[in-house]
């Protein structure tokens, strides 16, 4: 590399002498910049960036011509060779210098070209651009530390440090540099937009919104947390200022004052619509994997429990509320839009036929699959036909939940169970077909509305609606709730959703509830799902429901069901009671057949631990229900297990002793009643 003094002299001289040949000037800056970045020391790189910044500030006319062509080269200086991801950005003179250069370009450069450059660079950012592993990054950094590390304590960091976690806090250095570069580009794009003088600003804002949406969508799963993207979109929307119309517009008979005023009005409206769109998109997409806790808060309120958020969720809630307030400032009619979502959900599901329309089992299976895919098909078709700038309905749903989190009030006073079910299915089933539609945050708000519907609507109305609802819709709801809950890692959320599922099973017709349980036992690939419905089946078979169906008594039963408690002291004459599931020979035989299949699976060479646990669950249930269960069926189960136990070695079968003990318990019962 040439001496740095010579390089700086050449660049400085070029700004003075080559103003007529700007292409050569840009080429010179690019060549020397590349050379210094690859071969120079930290101090040499710092001097180059500082000199370039000074030249850009002192030569505004030249900056106006070439500024848009420099950002790509400047971003190359933001690399692991120049930036210690463990250090403070405020002490890194290269980072500070690059930011100053971007600022100089944003206020002096040709705004339209700068905007296009910023959007192109933001679109091209990808984590694969920083492909080395974290450990290799750290080792390479240590190797070059003597030449590249900045001197200690230069200036304080003026950036928002929350957006740039240290190496240990970040998922990877890839994420660190992706955040750093995108932060600079977001600011650059916003500053460029403000300076564009045009009668049609929506054209440029629309381009920015489109690029930002693509960037957010592409990286929503890349970042370790969603706070960075939430902040960037929020800051962009908050700081956007609609530019004034150009003052040099010539009004004449071809373009009158009335025409001018109409264009200004339409442009103003379109800009607001674009910001509304970005606001609803920006709140929903970054938090696809973050629950809002609206359902948790409502559940705690129902049970008079204290609702507490961790520091992690508190920070999210603060941003949620900022978005909520911003939506109001943009005149988003949250309640009206939410009602539009409900209407759309009705359109999707209102035509689902009743079970009686299915002539055979094959037709039933087709209809069940159809219900699963209805929302996904609708969403794909809607996206293909979408021509206008509309709100992101995921964001609208989130705002309905944030309204409750923020105000402790419900967005709508009345929500019937049918609409709540349609809403839940509309925003959860598409994710079963494409991860594009996966959104934990929206799902948590949808569950909140299910809770709200079954606890505020009169019980008789809820039961009537569920009875009249298509069985295919009801079963899809139950299956999706169970399936998603089985993969839920948060214990509290899993318990709350299981309680919701239990309550729904208490409210739907007994025939539908048992068919659902049996279907899970026969077909579900998830062992936890089978274990869960068996526990529910046990309690629904033992718990009494008043013949008058008193509200308070039903609530008490459901509460006990949710906790899966057993109380053998509740005895009553069979003629005076009815259970949620009345045991009869056909129901017992159906469950018995499922148990026999589990016995067969548990005593094979490739038996899984989940099969053994499921077998133990069956035995626990038979022990609890032994006095009401068919004795002959129980004896068959005991005999099958006895014969299989004799054919295996104790140390080869997990839980061998537990199986033996529980099976002996049943055998002892038969001995005692002889």
From Swiss-Prot:
Changing residue 343 to E: In strain: W303-1a. Transmembrane segments: none annotated. GO terms for molecular function: DNA-binding transcription factor binding; protein-disulfide reductase activity. It comes from the Eukaryota. The keyword Magnesium does not apply. It is found in: Cytoplasm. Pfam families: Kinetochor_Ybp2 (PF08568). GO terms for biological process: cellular response to oxidative stress; protein-containing complex assembly. One of its GO terms (cellular component) is cytoplasm. Keywords: Cytoplasm, Stress response. Interacts with YAP1. Forms a peroxide stress induced complex with YAP1 in the cytoplasm. Systematic proteome-wide 2-hybrid interaction studies suggest that YAP1, HYR1/GPX3, and YBP1 all interact with the nuclear pore complex subunit NUP116, which is involved in nucleocytoplasmic transport. Involved in oxidative stress response and redox homeostasis. Required for hydrogen peroxide-induced oxidation and nuclear localization (activation) of YAP1. Functions probably in concert with HYP1/GPX3, the actual YAP1 modifying enzyme. YBP1 is not required for HYP1/GPX3-independent, diamide-induced oxidation of YAP1. Belongs to the YBP1 family. Present with 3100 molecules/cell in log phase SD medium. This is YAP1-binding protein 1. The gene is YBP1.
């Amino acid at each position: 590399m040439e001496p740095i003094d010579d390089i700086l002299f050449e660049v400085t001289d070029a700004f003075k002498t080559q103003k007529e040949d700007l292409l050569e000037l840009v080429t010179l800056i690019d060549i020397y910049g590349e050379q210094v970045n690859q071969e120079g020391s930290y101090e040499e790189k710092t001097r180059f960036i500082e000199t370039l910044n000074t030249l850009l500030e002192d030569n505004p006319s030249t900056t106006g011509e070439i500024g848009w062509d420099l950002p790509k080269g400047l971003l190359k200086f933001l690399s692991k060779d120049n930036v210690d991801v463990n250090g403070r950005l405020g002490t890194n003179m290269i980072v500070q210098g690059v930011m100053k250069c971007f600022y100089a370009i944003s206020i002096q450069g040709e705004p339209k070209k700068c905007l296009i450059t910023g959007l192109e660079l933001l679109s091209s950012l990808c984590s694969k651009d920083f492909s080395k592993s974290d450990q290799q990054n750290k080792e390479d950094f240590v190797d070059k530390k003597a030449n590249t590390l900045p001197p200690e304590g230069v200036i304080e960091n003026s950036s928002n440090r929350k957006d740039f976690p240290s190496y240990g806090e970040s998922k990877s250095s890839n994420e660190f540099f992706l955040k750093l570069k995108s932060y600079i580009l977001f600011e650059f794009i916003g500053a460029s937009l403000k300076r564009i003088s045009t009668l049609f600003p929506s054209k440029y804002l629309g381009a920015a919104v489109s690029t930002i949406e693509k960037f957010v969508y592409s990286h929503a799963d890349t970042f370790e947390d969603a706070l960075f993207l939430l902040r960037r979109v929020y800051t962009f929307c908050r700081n956007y200022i609609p530019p004034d119309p150009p003052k040099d517009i010539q009004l004449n008979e071809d373009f009158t004052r009335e025409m001018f005023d109409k264009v200004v009005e339409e442009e103003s409206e379109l800009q607001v619509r674009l910001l509304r769109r970005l606001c609803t998109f920006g709140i929903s997409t970054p938090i696809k994997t973050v629950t809002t806790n609206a359902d948790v808060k409502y559940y705690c309120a129902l049970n008079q429990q204290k609702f507490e958020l961790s520091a992690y969720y508190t920070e999210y809630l603060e941003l949620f509320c900022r978005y909520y307030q911003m939506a109001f400032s943009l005149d988003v009619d949250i309640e009206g839009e939410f009602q539009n979502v409900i209407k759309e959900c009705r359109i999707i599901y209102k035509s689902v036929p009743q079970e009686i329309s299915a002539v055979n089992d094959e037709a039933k299976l087709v209809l069940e699959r159809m219900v699963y895919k209805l929302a996904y098909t609708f969403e794909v078709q809607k996206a293909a036909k979408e021509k206008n700038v509309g709100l992101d309905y995921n964001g609208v749903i989130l705002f309905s939940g944030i309204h409750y989190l923020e105000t402790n009030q419900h967005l709508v006073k009345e929500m019937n169970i049918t609409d709540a079910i349609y809403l839940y299915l509309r925003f959860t089933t598409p994710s079963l077909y494409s991860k594009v539609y996966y959104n934990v945050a929206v799902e948590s708000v949808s569950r909140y509305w299910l809770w709200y519907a079954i606890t505020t609507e009169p019980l008789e109305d809820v039961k009537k609606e569920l009875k009249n609802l298509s069985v295919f819709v009801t079963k899809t709801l139950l299956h999706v709730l169970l399936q998603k809950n089985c993969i839920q890692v948060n214990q509290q959320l899993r318990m709350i959703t299981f309680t919701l599922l239990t309550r729904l099973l208490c409210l739907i017709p007994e025939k539908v509830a048992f068919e659902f349980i049996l279907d899970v036992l026969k077909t579900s690939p998830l062992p936890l799902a089978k274990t869960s419905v068996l526990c529910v089946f046990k309690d629904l078979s033992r718990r009494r429901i008043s013949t008058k169906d008193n509200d308070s008594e039903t609530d008490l039963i459901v509460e006990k069901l949710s906790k899966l408690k057993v109380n053998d002291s509740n005895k009553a004459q069979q003629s005076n009671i009815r259970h949620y599931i009345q045991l009869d020979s056909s129901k017992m035989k159906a469950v018995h057949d499922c148990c026999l299949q589990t016995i067969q699976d548990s005593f094979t060479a490739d038996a899984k631990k989940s099969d053994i646990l499921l077998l133990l669950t069956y035995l626990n249930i038979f022990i609890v229900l032994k006095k009401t269960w068919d004795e002959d069926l129980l004896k068959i189960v005991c005999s099958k297990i006895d014969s299989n136990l004799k054919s295996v070695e104790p140390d080869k079968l997990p839980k061998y002793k537990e199986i033996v003990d529980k099976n002996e318990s049943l055998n002892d019962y038969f001995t005692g009643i002889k």
